[in-house]
Every structure is written in C-alpha cells, then in structure tokens.
Amino acid sequence: MHDLDHYPKSTQKIRKQLEQTGLVISEYLPYQKPLKHHFPERNRLISGLSKGVLITESTIKSGTSITTNCALEQNREVYVLPGSMFNDMTMGNLMSAQEGAKIVISPKDIIDDFD
C-alpha cells in the first residue's frame, strides 16, 4: 500500500505495521492532499469503527472533541480521564463528561463497562 499520501508523516512506523498486519482505510483517492474538512470526516470514521473511545486530553475546540461528538451521536461509548477545570487541555474532557461521557480513572473501569 504505497500509493496513499499519509498524514502526518510522523506516523510512518506504525503505518508500516498496520500495512503488514492490519487495515488502512481512506475515503480519499491516492495522493489526495489532506484538507481541513477531511479531518472531521476522518474522526467520524475513527469513532464509527470503534466500540468506544477514550479521551485523555482535549481542548474545547479540537479534533478530539469532534471525535467525541461523533462517537456520542453514533451511540458509542465515550470515556474521559478527569482533568482540572483550570487546564485548557482537559476542558474538553469535562465538557464531554457533562454531555454523557463516562469518567474513568483506571483501565479496569473500561473493562468492567464492556463486560
């Protein structure tokens, strides 16, 4: 699978592993450059293909927040790590919790929820 224009380039190592043993999908043609509106569309796929998503850090306006909103709309489980209301990097987590995401403090919380 050498004909896709991957973004970001920093994911090359894990991408190579996925190409060997997993699956790489795209809604776009090979060599199509990433455009701003592609990212929310990609995030919709990420959440749609998942049983649930774990949010570790998210600002109020971020790609992570878009993924969270997509997951909630798709009736996926959304888990968030708690954060400080004084930290911009976790304000998205707190807002997601208000919108229905489950607060978790250990991996066991998620495992128990899946059982």
Q: What residue spans do the PLM features occupy?
A:
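Glycine-biased, small-residue-rich flexible motifs in mid-sequence functional cores and linkers
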Residues: M1-D115
